[in-house]
Every structure is written in C-alpha cells, then in structure tokens.
C-alpha cells in the first residue's frame, strides 16, 4: 500500500475512533458508569467547560460532581450527540464539534429538562487511544418543565445563555 493510501486509511480510522469516543462518554453518563466516563478524558490536566454546570481542570473534578449530582436512580438521562465534524490535525491531535440533544427526567422532584447545544472538543492520541483533552459545551436552547399532577408547567423555555 502506498504511503498516501496508508495515511488516508489511518485518518479514517482516527475519525472513526473519535466518532466512537464521544458516544462512549455520553453512554457512560447515561448508564452512570463513572470509570468508563472518566476513561474518555485525558488523565492529567484537561480543560472541561460545561458553562453553568462547572469548569474543571482535571477529570477527577468532573467525576466528583458527576457522582454527587447525576449518579442517582431518579436521574433518568439521555444524551444524543449527532452531526459530528472531526478534523484530524496531525498523528496525535484532533478537534471536533458535535450537536447535542439532552433529556432528563428527574423522578424525585418531578421535573423534565430538554437541552440542545454543541460541544467543541479537542482530542489527544495517547498510547494509540484517543481521549478528550478539552471540551466546551455551549447551550442553545432549553425547556424546563415541572410535573404537577397531570399537568406540565413551563419553568423556562429559551436560550440558556
């Protein structure tokens, strides 16, 4: 195989690996798999900016918040990433953007949240594995509902920014 063809195949393999990385992270969040979620991020310093949820410089800080806030049976979450745009910069660096549609049913306080936005990510290949080294979530729209008997009350609808 020519060097050019080898490099093209490697680029496609890298794109596919990153296109599997983000859903691995989101599925781990939905299933409350803390170790799997943690493994998708760079082990040492990484930049995580989830806006109002928090900013973190290390994956352990995100794990702490995730464990305290989201890892409960009453938090029924569903993350759906779509429309990925992945750019392989070089052999070990890549960037990407994803659209996100998120739903949360909180059975403890009878609330429902839907959120749309986008992730802007940077990835690093370490020991032949892609990990998230930087991520930012930018919210576009949110619908927050309160369940009151058989009625839904709109708490907020619009742009969270």
Which stretches of residues belong to each language-model region?
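A solvent-exposed, acidic/Ser-Thr-rich amphipathic alpha-helical stretch
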Residues: 34-100
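Short, low-complexity N-terminal intrinsically disordered segments enriched in polar/charged residues
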Residues: 1-27, 31, 35-39
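Solvent-exposed, flexible loop/coil residues
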Residues: 16, 52, 60, 142, ...
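Intrinsic disorder/low-complexity signal
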Residues: 12-13, 18, 29, 48, ...
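Short linear sequence motifs
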Residues: 18-19, 34, 59, 112, ...
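A beta-strand edge to alpha-helix "cap/lid" segment located at domain peripheries
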Residues: 2-6, 71-161
């Amino acid at each position: 195989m020519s060097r050019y063809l080898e490099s093209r195949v490697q680029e496609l393999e890298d794109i596919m690996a990153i296109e599997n990385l983000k859903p691995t992270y989101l599925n781990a969040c939905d299933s409350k798999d803390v170790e799997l979620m943690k493994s998708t991020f760079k082990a040492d310093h990484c930049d995580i900016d989830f806006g109002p949820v928090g900013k973190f410089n290390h994956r352990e800080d995100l794990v702490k918040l995730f464990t305290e806030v989201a890892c409960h049976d009453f938090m029924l979450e569903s993350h759906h990433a779509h429309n990925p745009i992945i750019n392989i910069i070089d052999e070990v660096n890549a960037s990407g953007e994803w659209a996100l549609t998120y739903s949360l049913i909180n059975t403890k306080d009878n609330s429902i949240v839907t959120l749309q936005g986008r992730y802007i990510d940077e990835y690093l290949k370490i020991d032949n594995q892609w990990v998230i080294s930087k991520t930012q979530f930018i919210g576009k729209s949110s619908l927050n509902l309160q369940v009151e008997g058989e009625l839904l009350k709109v708490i907020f609808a619009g742009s969270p920014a």
